[in-house]
Design a protein with these regions (language model features):
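Phosphate/nucleotide-binding beta-alpha loop and adjacent structural elements of enzyme active sites
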Residues: 1-237
Length: 237
């Protein structure tokens, strides 16, 4: 258990298992500030956009795909308290901690994977620890639900939320996610994506993402392990 300081001066308890994976993700997010917008040249512009969405009476939508035990969701909620977060994690034990660590926040935690279309896939444990589970359509393994970005964004917009950030860290699953049905990309001012060619050499897992964003008017900024893809202009809600 750790205590995370909040902007209002309070603290929030955050439970972990003491494993290398859990401690690693906590260090990346809360100590190294992997998802902070402040180092970005356009960071203040994005923070200003967040303020305008809130001032309009709507909730900024943050989509957290590969939410693990909830560190990223809690970080985003601390940074953008008026946001609504949809957090997806397909591995059951991780999901249980995600649900516990985000209880009482405006976080819609779902035990599911993300993909280009609704359906099912297999969950595979390659032995990388609790942060390394992968999904594969043709592999043997536990069957898990897949929710499409198109569906999630449509549901959120129908509820009056405005796409703001999509954070995607899905251990190579980006190959399938960005392979088709990518109109939702244009609705998010900011994508934060970890690519996994370093983990999966010769698999081409980054290829579909690169093809998807190459033809769009977006900045492409590498920071740490993540790509920050920032739209030139905002598409609006």
């Amino acid at each position: 258990m750790i205590r995370i300081p909040l902007k209002d001066g309070g603290e929030r308890r955050f439970r972990h298992r003491g494993t290398r994976a859990d401690l690693g993700v906590i260090a990346q997010i809360f100590k190294a500030q992997d998802y902070s917008l402040r180092p970005l040249r356009r960071g203040r512009e994005l923070e200003s956009l967040y303020g305008r969405i809130v001032a309009s009476g709507k909730a900024p939508l943050i989509l957290d795909a590969g939410a693990n035990i909830g560190a990223s969701a809690v970080y985003f909620k601390r940074s953008f308290p008026a946001s609504h977060i949809v957090a997806l994690e397909p591995e059951r034990n991780n999901f249980e901690l995600l649900a516990e660590n985000t209880a009482g926040l405006d976080v819609d935690a779902r035990c599911a994977a993300i993909g280009s279309a609704d359906g099912e896939t297999s969950l595979v444990d390659p032995g990388e620890g609790e942060w390394g589970y992968r999904t594969s359509v043709g592999a043997a393994g536990e069957r898990v639900s897949v929710l499409s970005c198109t569906r999630l964004v449509a549901e959120s917009r129908a509820a009056g939320q405005v796409p703001f950030i999509a954070k995607i860290d899905i251990e190579g699953g980006e190959a399938e996610l960005f392979s088709r049905h990518t109109d939702w990309v244009d609705l998010f001012p900011l994508l934060i994506v970890e690519l996994h060619d370093w983990l999966l050499p010769r698999a081409g897992s980054a290829r579909s993402f690169l093809r998807c964003v190459a033809g769009r008017d977006r900045d492409f900024v590498y920071r740490g392990e993540n790509v920050f893809s920032i739209a030139y202009e905002w598409a609006g809600g």
